[in-house]
Amino acid sequence: MVSPLTRGLACVVALFSAAATAGAQNRRPMTFMDIMELKNVGGVSLSPNGSKVAYAVSGWEHPNARPSTDPAKPDTAKGDKHETRAHIWMVGAAGGTPRQLTFSERGENAPQWSPDGRSLAFLSSRGSGTEAKTQIWILPMDGGEAYQLTASKENVSGFEWSKDGSRIAFLAVDTLPKTDEAKTTRRDDPQVFEENFRLSHAWVIDVATKRATEVAHGNLTVSGAPSWSPDGTRLAFQAAPTTMLRDPRSDIYIVTIADKSLKKITTKPEAGSPPAWSPDGKTIAFTILPQSHIARPDSIMDREIGNDHLILYDVASGKARDTYDPKIDVSAGNPRWTSDGARVLFTTGERAWNAVYAYDVASNKLNRVVAKMLIGTPSLSKDGRLAAYTLGSSDAPADVYVSDLTFASPKKLTDINPQLRDIALGETEVITWKSTDGTPVEGVLLKPLGYQAGRKYPLLVEAHGGPTGATNAGFKANWGSPGQVWAGQGWAVLYPNPRGSTNYGEKFTRANIMDWGGGDYRDIMTGVDDVIKRGIADSSKMAFEGWSYGGYMTAWVVSQTSRFKAARMGAGLSDLQSMYGTTDIPGYIGTFFSGIPTQKTLDFYRARSAITFVDNVTTPLLIQQGGSDQRVPIGQSMEFFRALKDRGRTVQLVFYPREGHGLSEYYHQLDKMQREQAWITKYTLGAERVVP
């Protein structure tokens, strides 16, 4: 339910709305409840003939429970649990009214057309019983109810139709042996750390008979969807020896279905994407990180930092062509072949946006097709004339669009969040500045609602996670980054992309190796200075926050400067030495700090840990984290909290039960946003202001 404090201060929103500028007309500022009501679209699939688009719409649902934003009206079904669910929709590629195709309480996602366009496959756990597993379901498009195709004892994931539509390849997790099931039942179930992984293997099921056969078994776990050869005799897939996240020992394999023989086709580890078979069956496209970036490719202790290269593997000769162009300097995304096999398309992050690139097979050239679009991976029609995809903007979440393969004139097919027309939004601008060493740095600046030049505003700085990530110019309205709510309350929000971020070339991405808290910190602080110089930020009213690596940067910032009046550290790293020994991605940490902590490297681990400088911290700090986080174990938050608490500093630590590295439960997401907003406004502005 919405807290009494939230209800009691709901009038703040109304008062602020009345003071909004004429440009916003009668629209009101965004609230956290507005964020919780937003829908998201994904899983776009264009029918083979290009006439229809299937897609999944997800959002929070509960048939009997909705928190009330009206203080006079109580919550319905108080205490009931909210669930996030997706359902399959369809719309004509020429336009028209979208139609919902699925309605189950368990939800559905990942729609995929059969090659003849007569059926639509999707994933759902809509089977009977509370412990129903995710299975593949088939919806006949000429009428009738969807039926369950697979009957796996464990969850099914990535899948793909064979080219003739008679079979589907899919992934399923290994089942527990009966002896293990019995031990689990009686709670005789000790776990050996980093051993006995439950792997995912590739299966093939006959659509007509529903007979499923495992085709790739062994000490490999397959990820992503398998890719069929055009003649239906083989599958290509990506696999690694363990299920450990970011296991660098990932390769591409081909399995012959008839005899289940397996062939590894990569000679260097670190495959970055699932493979895609060319229409003529002669070539397989996938991405990989060059071995030069991996010091010990046979070890979990080394991990990639750099651009993924698009590789074309000739099936007959076994030769691989690296298509990377250092002059273009982008990281390749998941490859998609055009229907004629002449080009391979991929989307990639490029500065504060996305771009689509095409590799021309004949000319051996990589070219940008379109830039400065927040575009998702396109789904192509069989004749190669049309593409369907998601497309977002700074002012709205993504909707479904269709266009030709130039992507020049996208046509909008959906209106997923029409309620946004009643909400006034802050303006988004991409800005650049120079760091202390002259390095150009870019960031996204969200201006306060009703911004007036010459007026100074409170500034919130949000550091992104990663560090191999970037903040784009997209819509800032989700539990992790509710920037539009802050803008609606009169704040400017800066999202810097310091060195170490992706999207700005490989050299920039690798620039913070052995330098966490160094150049990246200076990049951020010079960005803050730039916003102050622009006359936008009030230097006496600034706050800082971030999650994951952004949480590390938050802890580091408050240990290095007292410029910020308040801060919020989300799932952040405070002690890099203990982080290395307890995280589920030790190799990723080790890559940035010259391998495992040793007598030689220990001083550096300590020198870049905020816990070392905890005596310097005076900024009031809110710490938030999932209680079951394995990526950044909760000890990182507890260490920093205890050190600050014992020194008499202003600090609060909040754990969210059952949550991992991110927050997935309704009331946890809502509390995270409201609590951080109350904390930051209290210590920055001197008064609590909680938005519903």
Enumerate the language-model features and the residues they cover.
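Hydrophobic beta-strand positions that form the internal "hydrophobic ladder"
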Residues: 53, 117-121, 168, 232-235, ...
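Non-catalytic accessory segments flanking enzyme active sites
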Residues: 45, 56-57, 61-65, 169-171, ...
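Short loop/turn segments that connect beta-strands within beta-propeller blades
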Residues: 92-96, 140-144, 206-210, 256-260, ...
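Active-site-proximal cap/loop segments of hydrolase catalytic domains
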Residues: 84, 207, 462, 479-489, ...
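A flexible loop/linker signature enriched in serine peptidases of the S9 family
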Residues: 57-87, 102-109, 121-137, 145, ...
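Short beta-strand element of the alpha/beta-hydrolase
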Residues: 455-465
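Residue-level detector of Asp-centered blade-edge/turn motifs that repeat once per structural unit
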Residues: 48-49, 115-116, 163-164, 230-231, ...
